[in-house]
Amino acid sequence: MKFLYGIVFIALFLTVMFATQTDGCGPCFTTDANMARKCRECCGGIGKCFGPQCLCNRI
């Protein structure tokens, strides 16, 4: 069972790392009220906070 948890953790980690590298903007913090605006500006007007990440390919 620990092996399965390890595989799931690695898959999740790699997914987050890949998404962060391909989209280039910083994380979205829920404590910052202007985070959605900062994410949009970082992505040239098309960015959107998706969970803790700012993704530039989300509309």
Curated annotation (Swiss-Prot):
Disulfide bonds join C25-C42, C28-C49, C39-C54, C43-C56. It comes from the Eukaryota. The presence of a 'disulfide through disulfide knot' structurally defines this protein as a knottin. The record marks R37, K38, R40 as: Important for the binding to the catalytic site of MMP2. It holds the Pfam family Toxin_5. One of its GO terms (cellular component) is extracellular region. It comes from Olivierus martensii. Toxin with unknown function in healthy organisms. On glioma cells, inhibits chloride currents in a voltage-dependent manner (when tested on gliomas cells). Also interacts with MMP2 and significantly inhibits its catalytic activity. May be internalized with chloride channels (probably ClC-3/CLCN3) and MMP2, thus inhibiting the chloride channels necessary for cell shrinkage and tumor propagation. Expressed by the venom gland. This is Chlorotoxin-like BmK CT. It is found in: Secreted. Negative results: does not inhibit potassium and sodium currents. InterPro entries: Scorpion_toxin-like_sf, Scorpion_toxinS_Cl_inh. Residues 1-24 form the signal peptide. Keywords: Chloride channel impairing toxin, Disulfide bond, Ion channel impairing toxin, Knottin, Metalloenzyme inhibitor, Metalloprotease inhibitor, Pharmaceutical, Protease inhibitor, Secreted, Signal, Toxin, Voltage-gated chloride channel impairing toxin.
